[in-house]
């Protein structure tokens, strides 16, 4: 499943032009990444993790097509229940088994959705920190 068009269309030249005059904030940069890429949902709500079937995705999970994360795959995205589909936060995971850390973007995630995501990462050898975007 993909979310394209409008805010989530693929407009990298538009993103470059919008920020050509100077530095951007963390949140503006995330808005630009999400706005300039298509969200591909490859693990829909209710699906099981491919390597750990005991883990069930209670929210849609996917990636930004055409982007690259630390694991050389697309930047991961959690899609929450807020229909406005705006960047609402970011999280960092630390996995001591894989010896890695990753950034994931939260789109449309409410406080309740963030609690669900925290539970998903609650394992003995991993840690998660969620940074919620303050409302203007």
Where are the regions that the model predicts?
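Hydrophobic N-terminal alpha-helices or hydrophobic patches in metabolic proteins across all domains
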Residues: 4-136
């Amino acid at each position: 499943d993909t979310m394209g068009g409008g805010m989530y269309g693929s407009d990298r030249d538009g993103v470059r032009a919008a920020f050509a005059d100077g530095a951007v904030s963390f949140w503006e940069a995330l808005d630009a990444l999400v706005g300039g890429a298509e969200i591909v949902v490859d693990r829909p709500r209710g699906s099981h993790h491919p390597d750990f079937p005991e883990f069930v995705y209670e929210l849609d999970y996917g990636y930004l097509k055409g982007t690259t994360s630390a694991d050389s795959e697309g930047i991961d995205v959690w899609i929450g229940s807020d229909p406005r589909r705006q960047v609402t936060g970011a999280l960092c995971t630390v996995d001591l088994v894989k010896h890695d850390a990753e950034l994931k973007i939260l789109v449309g995630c409410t406080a309740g959705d963030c609690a669900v995501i925290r539970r998903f990462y609650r394992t003995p050898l991993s840690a998660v920190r969620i940074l919620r975007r303050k409302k203007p």
